[in-house]
Amino acid sequence: MGVSRVLYVEGGTPLKGELRVYPAKNAALPILAASLLTPEPITLVEVPRLRDVEVMLELLAHLGTQYAWEGRTLHLQTPEIKSTHAPYELVGQMRASFIVWGALLARAGEGHVSMPGGCAFGFRPVDQHIKALEALGAEVWEEDGTFHARRTRPLSGRVVFDLPTVGGTEQAMLAVALGGEATLVQAAVEPEVVDLGHFLALLGAEVEGLGSPIVRIKGAPRLKGGTYRIIPDRIEAGTYLLAAAATRGSLTLEGVRPDHLDALLDKLWRSGHRLEVGEDWIRFRATPDPAPFHVEAREYPGFPTDLQPIATAYLATVPGQSTVVDRIYPDRFTHVGELARMGAELYLRDRILTVQGRRLHGAQVKALDIRAGGALVVAALSAEGASEIEGVYFLERGYEHLTERLQALGARVHLRESPVALAAD
């Protein structure tokens, strides 16, 4: 027998209290990749201390970056690129690490990156990344599970994406930031993409149109260093709001960007909950009798796909019928079977999930990706009885100090070891 860590949750306690939102992981990762573009020192203030960030730093160190933590502040410098190969053992752990491809191509003239890994839900191709780099003038090919690219001049051109793509947009921005120039059509408008653009502007690139479908970027021959503060994590903020809603609690979030959460806040308001919103804070008070609603996850400013599983868990506690559709990842429903183990009534047909809300009960469940894990935590907090959630690894990739922060809000949760049968040789 071996042991694994599980999150033990005794449900039924409304969450109450105040919470300061941590910086956004999905903004930090491409900004970390962008640090490869300059030999000058970079300081990032308030960086999330998550497993995904540590994996990205391991990859950057392999490529030539020197870094040091000072509390939650991160100091980085890449005097030279020591390797242009991003190996599978690092890239395979996290899809976002694929973004170093464009930065390597810009700084070193070539980049070789293994097929990305990360959360296993749906089909998430990299064809738009390849299309962007080829449109900008790079030679791109794939061999034995590794993507290769090289250039003979600074990359420039016009990229027309087939659809808005966060990763593809970020990849193109990094590829041209050092001496190149590009117009990106159907660019992603997510806050994390905008944050990367602001960071590149700090380093010396000229960026226009951020937050719109057409972005123009003109790189500088040499980028400088600087100090930057990453935006708050809208997905973390949304997860805690939905947890408070599911447990019929009350929550004040500080250090948040309410304008990044318009789609969720509108749904919560229409569900009957009370909300007060300031420039950088949200006060939430749950109604005891919330109404069901329809969720359709789509590109920003629509409802975030990363909050779709967590919203599903909340709706499973709301009497009446709700429906959930994900236009970004239509098969992102790895959480459905596990929620059903807790008594949730869920029916998936033609990629439309129908949710019939009811009181949930505790169960042994397993997180299969980061946000499915968040969904199971929300469900367990609201359920009657105790739950054990396996897959703590995924939770630690997406939620910093999750156990401690939930405890501070009154939740009865803790990590503990659970026996696991080992496979025979």
UniProtKB/Swiss-Prot annotation:
GO MF annotations, alphabetized = UDP-N-acetylglucosamine 1-carboxyvinyltransferase activity
Q: Where in the cell is it found?
A: Cytoplasm
Cellular component, GO annotation: cytoplasm
UniProt keyword Transferase, yes or no? yes
What PANTHER family does the entry give?
UDP-N-ACETYLGLUCOSAMINE 1-CARBOXYVINYLTRANSFERASE
Q: What does this protein do?
A: Cell wall formation. Adds enolpyruvyl to UDP-N-acetylglucosamine.
Protein's name in the database: UDP-N-acetylglucosamine 1-carboxyvinyltransferase
**Which organism encodes this protein?**
Thermus thermophilus (strain ATCC BAA-163 / DSM 7039 / HB27)
